[in-house]
């Protein structure tokens, strides 16, 4: 049954995916007008002069900042958020969870170690990016390094943005921007190319919270990632999955079949040893199909389940809990989360603007982790069944690996459940599935968010 469902789904998606292959200019980057570094040691450095196109960064009902664009030139709009991460800008910019957001870096210098290649590993996963394309609607930085140095780098940040048809610019006092966002909360904003800000454009602000962003970043048809010699087969619901989540699972001995976010997973769960729900962008309220499918799954199956980030929120909603929008979210690589079962504190990587309201969890679930900075919920677990989820990212990339053991815990749950079966079931992907399904995401391309106002 699963093989036929997956093959039919893949065939239906092929036609619509064919029309989404074009790349579009949809992002803008800001750089500071401060003096740029003159050079670096260790290798020949490509040099590119900064762009001279003026641009403005406008926060709705807030201040206007002026700067210079670098990369492609295009007007964009989205939700302005900030990250305090010191490194990992290639991973952050390609993280599907940032879809629809203008990302402000508090680190004053961005681009000093360049941008790596799109090389893939032994599992056909991207080594250095979290998805094949830039995902955020735009970035704002204080200063951009036109000279870079790193052994993995193949191009500069500005070259990468231009190649991805992404417009960028200095400018701005990012301290003032972050202060505003911290006090007022995440806000709608836009980046406009041109000399002057036009107040008449205020109506064109796009609120990504009103858009089903998961639909845009999720694979349009199932695909498979084989772990050679693996005895486990996990169904992963793709709400905008990061490459390193896939890598953490397949490298630990689990082959994966990755499904679109709205796939009726409860209908094929018997053909898998576990179910995993990935991270993703936007408001979880738009994923009602996923919530319904997960609720049906837990009603009809005892299969082990794990969720991360948006996957955590959707799993919580499926059991009746509620989510809330945070004032400015948690986006950093150094956020402490307390394990309430052991009393241990883990330094975690986080990227989310919504959180689960722990007071609404049903009695058969309990809090697993709590944020030591703001007290928000960071995880939950079932009291008797092998179901748990985390708001933070145990796969990091970038960030600390303190909590990567959670992938091992999940796969231990999967193996234990498989061993407890009265009749052994070989759920490994068949040769038919390996031959028919794609080996990477299907039909996911950059889309200009401004076009969906």
Curated annotation (Swiss-Prot):
Q: Which residues form the Glutamine amidotransferase type-1 domain?
A: 233-420
Q: What does this protein do?
A: Small subunit of the arginine-specific carbamoyl phosphate synthase (CPSase). CPSase catalyzes the formation of carbamoyl phosphate from the ammonia moiety of glutamine, carbonate, and phosphate donated by ATP, the first step of the arginine biosynthetic pathway. The small subunit (glutamine amidotransferase) binds and cleaves glutamine to supply the large subunit with the substrate ammonia.
| Organism domain of life | Eukaryota
Sorted alphabetically, which Pfam families does this protein's record hold? CPSase_sm_chain, GATase
Return the SMART domains for the record. Answer: CPSase_sm_chain
Q: Which reactions is this enzyme annotated as catalysing? A: hydrogencarbonate + L-glutamine + 2 ATP + H2O = carbamoyl phosphate + L-glutamate + 2 ADP + phosphate + 2 H(+)
What organism is recorded for this protein? Answer: Hypocrea virens (Gliocladium virens)
In the UniProt record, the signal sequence range is: none
| Alphabetized UniProt keyword annotations | Amino-acid biosynthesis, Arginine biosynthesis, ATP-binding, Glutamine amidotransferase, Ligase, Mitochondrion, Nucleotide-binding, Transit peptide
Spell out the protein name for this chain: Carbamoyl phosphate synthase arginine-specific small chain
Which cellular component appears as one GO term in the record?
A: mitochondrial matrix
């Amino acid at each position: 049954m699963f093989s036929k469902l997956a093959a039919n789904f893949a065939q239906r998606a092929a036609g619509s995916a064919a029309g989404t292959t074009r790349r579009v200019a949809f992002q803008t980057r800001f750089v500071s007008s401060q003096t740029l570094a003159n050079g670096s040691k260790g290798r020949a450095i490509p040099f590119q002069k900064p762009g001279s196109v003026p641009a403005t960064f406008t926060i709705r009902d807030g201040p206007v900042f002026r700067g210079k664009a670098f990369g492609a030139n295009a007007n964009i709009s989205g939700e302005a958020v900030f990250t305090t991460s010191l490194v990992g800008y290639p991973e952050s910019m390609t993280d599907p969870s940032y879809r629809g957001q203008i990302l402000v870096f508090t680190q004053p210098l961005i681009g000093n170690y360049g941008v790596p290649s799109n090389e893939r590993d032994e599992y056909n996963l991207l080594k250095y990016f979290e998805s094949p394309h830039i995902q955020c609607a735009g970035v704002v930085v204080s200063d951009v390094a036109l000279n870079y140095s790193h052994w993995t780098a193949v191009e500069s940040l500005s070259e990468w943005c231009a190649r991805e048809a992404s417009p960028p610019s200095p400018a701005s006092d990012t301290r003032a921007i972050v202060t505003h966002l911290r006090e007022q909360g995440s806000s709608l904003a836009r980046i406009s190319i041109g000399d002057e800000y036009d107040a008449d454009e205020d109506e064109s602000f796009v609120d990504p919270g009103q858009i089903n962003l998961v639909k845009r970043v999720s694979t349009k048809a199932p695909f498979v990632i084989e772990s050679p010699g693996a005895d486990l087969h996990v169904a992963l619901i793709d709400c905008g999955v990061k490459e390193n989540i896939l890598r953490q699972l397949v490298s630990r001995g689990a082959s994966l079949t990755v499904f679109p976010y709205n796939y009726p997973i409860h209908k094929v769960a018997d053909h898998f040893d576990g179910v995993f729900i990935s991270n993703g962008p936007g408001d979880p309220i738009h994923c009602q199909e996923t919530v319904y499918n997960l609720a049906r799954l837990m009603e009809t199956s005892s299969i082990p389940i794990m969720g991360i980030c948006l996957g955590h929120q959707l799993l919580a909603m499926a059991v009746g809990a509620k989510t809330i929008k945070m004032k400015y979210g948690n986006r950093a690589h150094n956020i402490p989360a307390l394990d309430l079962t052991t009393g241990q504190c883990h330094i975690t990587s986080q990227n989310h603007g919504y959180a689960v309201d722990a007071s609404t969890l049903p009695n058969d679930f309990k809090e697993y982790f709590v944020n030591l900075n703001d007290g928000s919920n960071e995880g939950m677990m079932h009291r008797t069944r092998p179901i748990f989820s985390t708001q933070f990212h145990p796969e990091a990339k970038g960030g600390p690996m303190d909590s990567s053991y959670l992938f091992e815990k999940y796969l231990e749950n999967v193996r234990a459940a498989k061993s407890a079966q009265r009749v052994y079931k070989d759920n490994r992907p068949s040769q038919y599935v390996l031959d028919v399904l794609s080996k990477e995401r299907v039909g996911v391309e950059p889309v200009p968010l401004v076009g969906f106002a």
